[in-house]
């Protein structure tokens, strides 16, 4: 039986191949490691799929989705696929500092 991660990090993306690797790397570099990454690729026409497939980490999963780039719909798809106790969002052209999830986990622990 697998234990659910504390966090599901949902990354909706649409034609962000140039930024996506750095976004995913910033999550994989977290000091807090109880997370999964759910990437929702909204019918990208660039190399987004190739960037995602280059990650060989069991915490990274991808969902192919197509609704003409509506980010809210992609987030909802990611939420439904999430296994974590908490869902966090990261846009595919952003990054997190290394302690992001550790600090959020600490706040949750102190004030559930």
Question: Residue locations for each model-derived region?
Answer:
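Nucleotide-sugar donor-binding/catalytic module of glycosyltransferases
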Residues: 1-112
């Amino acid at each position: 039986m697998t234990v659910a991660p504390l966090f599901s990090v949902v990354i909706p993306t649409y034609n962000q191949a140039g930024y996506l690797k750095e976004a995913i790397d910033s999550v994989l570099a977290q000091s807090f490691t109880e997370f999964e990454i759910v990437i929702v690729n909204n019918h990208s026409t660039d190399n987004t799929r190739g960037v995602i497939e280059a990650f060989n980490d069991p915490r990274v999963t991808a969902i192919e989705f197509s609704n003409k780039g509506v980010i809210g719909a992609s987030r909802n798809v990611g939420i439904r696929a999430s296994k974590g106790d908490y869902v966090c969002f990261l846009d595919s052209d952003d990054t997190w500092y290394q302690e992001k999830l550790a600090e959020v986990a600490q706040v949750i622990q102190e004030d559930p």
